[in-house]
Amino acid sequence: MQLPANLAPISVEQDWQHTTAYPPLGFTPFAEGALGNGDTFGLYWPIGREAAEPIVVETWHDEWRVQPHFSSLAAFLSAYATAEDEYVATPSLADDPASPRAAYLEARELIAQRKPDAAIALLEAALAIVPEYTDALTLLHVQYVRAGRIDEAARVAIQAIISPPSFGGPPFKALQWLRTQPVPDGEPDPIWRACGQLSFNFGGSKENADYPVLLAAIDTYLEQGNYLSASTLMQTYAELMSAETVSFQERYAFAPAAFIARQIAVSAQLPNGSRDTSTLWLPDLA
């Protein structure tokens, strides 16, 4: 994983260990800008972009959400230096032209102004930085459908379905739409093949048939050597299952520590290496 060029201005929590589903694997908090109520800023390496410098995200602890505010540590530090009362607000595109969150918010405004092409360009730019940005994926999916870009809409719908709830959603419209599309002959993607078995209604029941489908899809991605999709869906599965009761988890043989250990091991198969940020601070790597 590629560290920022200059870490000196921030106080990184170097003993951070990924032991729970949230915040997601690939995140490490730092002290600057923290509000003291569990919400904090941190470095985050998007899935598949471990060879690039991290972005800076803000965790919204009560909501189990992660907001990809800043495209780089440098962009965050610029905002932090001028923040009133040390509260670092969401940047605008003028402040940080590559901010995924700013691009998403501006895209919503452009859609309201009936400027879909400009909105699509911004959403695509945001997803080039954070491929698992669920909010941006669900919004882009709708725009692709309206534009008649059906093949692209299908791929974005699948990505929205497998992307973590901490980055937005739920992707109900994408799932409902995908279920109406004929599955191409020989389609390799397990989510598209099995989307008719998914509801994405979680919590409040003793059983949920979605979980075995998602777990089987993870296994299929791994068999295909598709470690990007497997890692993405593993993060999603961990977050969804961690929101269930302990008795529910036990019924579905979900052992959080074992699953997270497997998730870290799978991430080591990614083209750019493991997403375990604790390895960044080992003596020979620091």
Residue ranges and their predicted role:
Residues 53-91:
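Compact, glycine/acidic-enriched structural inserts
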Residues 1-48, 84, 95, 100-103, ...:
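A surface-exposed partner-binding patch
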